[in-house]
């Protein structure tokens, strides 16, 4: 029910923007009328992942203007890593929630991103170690910044590890009392069903 949409398509910045706008228009039209009981609005939240492809704030704002034009803006729950981590842009004036992911390697990095205006943190308890993840979650909590879990296409056992972290996070803004966990292993592992069978309680 939480629609992850990859943006930042190949090409020049102008070509990328045009492709991203067209992709958003197509997806938004295809999902027209879809509803979920898990969001406050009842509509499907959109989660954009840019992987640092946007070079300038102005380009991202043009995408958001397009989202407003087609009626998709209110459904954008977050945009993850729109800019390269070395491109230290103040984002306080961007009117949607931006999330730090790859750029938040440590708790100190997370604090820096929060000070730059980022309003969410992606936790990766496997990639960034559980101990560092707890430190990042702590500083984010202290500053009132919500977190969610992303799993890097891990196996079923490690999905459970992430669930344990996600279950202890506060509700993500816009959701009805729910934490947020991204998992996509079932879409990428050929033998996912077999891998699940190794779990002592695969249907839990």
Regions found by a protein language model. Give the residues of each.
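Flexible C-terminal active-site loop/helix
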Residues: 153-204
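Glycine-rich active-site/cofactor-binding loop and its immediate structural neighborhood
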Residues: 1
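Catalytic core of soluble alpha/beta enzymes
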Residues: 5-153, 158-159
């Amino acid at each position: 029910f939480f629609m992850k949409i990859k943006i930042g398509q190949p090409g020049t910045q102008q070509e990328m923007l045009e492709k991203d706008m067209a992709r958003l228009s197509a997806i938004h039209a295809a999902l027209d009328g879809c509803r979920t009981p898990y969001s406050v609005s009842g509509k499907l939240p959109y989660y954009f992942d840019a992987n640092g492809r946007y070079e300038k704030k102005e380009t991202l704002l043009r995408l958001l203007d397009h989202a407003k034009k087609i009626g998709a803006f209110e459904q954008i729950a977050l945009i993850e890593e729109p800019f390269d981590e070395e491109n230290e842009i103040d984002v306080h004036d961007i009117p949607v929630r931006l999330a730090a992911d790859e750029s938040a390697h440590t708790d100190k990095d997370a604090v820096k991103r929060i000070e730059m205006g980022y309003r969410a943190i992606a936790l990766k308890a496997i990639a960034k170690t559980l101990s560092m993840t707890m430190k990042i979650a702590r500083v984010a909590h202290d500053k009132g910044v919500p977190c969610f879990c992303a799993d890097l296409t891990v196996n079923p056992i490690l999905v459970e590890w992430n669930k344990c972290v996600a279950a202890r996070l506060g509700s993500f803004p816009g959701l009805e009392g729910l934490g947020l966990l991204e998992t996509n292993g079932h879409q990428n592992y050929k033998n996912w069903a077999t891998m699940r069978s190794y779990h002592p309680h695969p249907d839990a």
